[in-house]
């Protein structure tokens, strides 16, 4: 039990030292990730459709 208490105290101390990002930074990062994901999904979907069309042309 003593080890757990020490671990918990160290975790709390570490969380107090963390510099958390501002809300606007988080929103910007989320937007970048979402846009990047959608763009990549569209790109991969287009490549997949091209491969399907190309392979159906030969087979």
Curated annotation (Swiss-Prot):
Gene3D superfamilies cross-referenced by the UniProt entry: Preprotein translocase secy subunit (1.20.5.1030)
Organism expressing this protein natively: Treponema pallidum (strain Nichols)
Protein name: Protein translocase subunit SecE
GO MF annotation, one: protein transmembrane transporter activity
Membrane-spanning intervals of the chain: 39-59
Assembly behavior: Component of the Sec protein translocase complex. Heterotrimer consisting of SecY, SecE and SecG subunits. The heterotrimers can form oligomers, although 1 heterotrimer is thought to be able to translocate proteins. Interacts with the ribosome. Interacts with SecDF, and other proteins may be involved. Interacts with SecA.
Membrane-related topology note: Single-pass membrane protein
Primary location class: membrane
InterPro entries: SecE_bac, SecE_sf, Translocase_SecE/Sec61-g
Family from the record: Belongs to the SecE/SEC61-gamma family.
Keywords: Cell inner membrane, Cell membrane, Membrane, Protein transport, Translocation, Transmembrane, Transmembrane helix, Transport
Cellular compartments per GO CC: plasma membrane
PANTHER family from the UniProt entry: PROTEIN TRANSLOCASE SUBUNIT SECE
Biological role: Essential subunit of the Sec protein translocation channel SecYEG. Clamps together the 2 halves of SecY. May contact the channel plug during translocation.
Cell compartment(s), UniProt: Cell inner membrane
One Gene Ontology term from the biological process aspect of the record: protein transport by the Sec complex
Keyword Transmembrane helix included in the entry's annotation: yes
